[in-house]
């Protein structure tokens, strides 16, 4: 698969700038798609349910956005639970970076102070390297902390697999 450290530096710098919480999970893939096409897809909140694990429906609330879909916009994700997950855009740099934070209630006490960072970097040999990071504070209870870490492994890992299916990996 290769070393992606040159392609993940911007994601990690962004995460370090926007969060004082530890990195909990990271997944990185090279996909056979242009940077613009991939970024437009993952930042289109109305289509998030097509690739985010467990999402049944998704939409955008732009009522507090500086620009629709950008900083202040909220991705609303409806899954099996009665209360939707709300993810507010914290930073946006098209076609390269999207950073968002989810409401603490979404994690059922497993994690708080969440920050997600996604970057799309063009690869010199073609395609795009996507990096998806999750930062947060895990619960102090060891079992809940373990479950919180698993939650990110499943959510980010499964979401990345869905992106691989849509845009074949290299």
Model-predicted regions and their roles:
Residues 1-63:
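Hydrophobic ligand-binding cavity/cleft-lining segments
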Residues 3-8, 135-170:
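A conserved amphipathic terminal alpha-helix motif
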Residues 19-21, 79-81, 108-112, 124-126:
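A generic structural micro-feature
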Residues 27-29, 85-91, 114-122:
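Hydrophobic/aromatic beta-strand elements that line small-molecule binding cavities or substrate pockets
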Residues 30, 50, 59-109, 161-170:
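Glycine-rich portal/gate segments that line the openings of hydrophobic small-molecule binding cavities
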Residues 31-33, 81, 136-140:
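Beta-strand elements of well-folded, non-transmembrane domains
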Residues 37-42, 48, 75, 89, ...:
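Hydrophobic pocket/interface hotspot
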Residues 101-107, 133-140:
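Short, solvent-exposed aromatic-acidic interface loops
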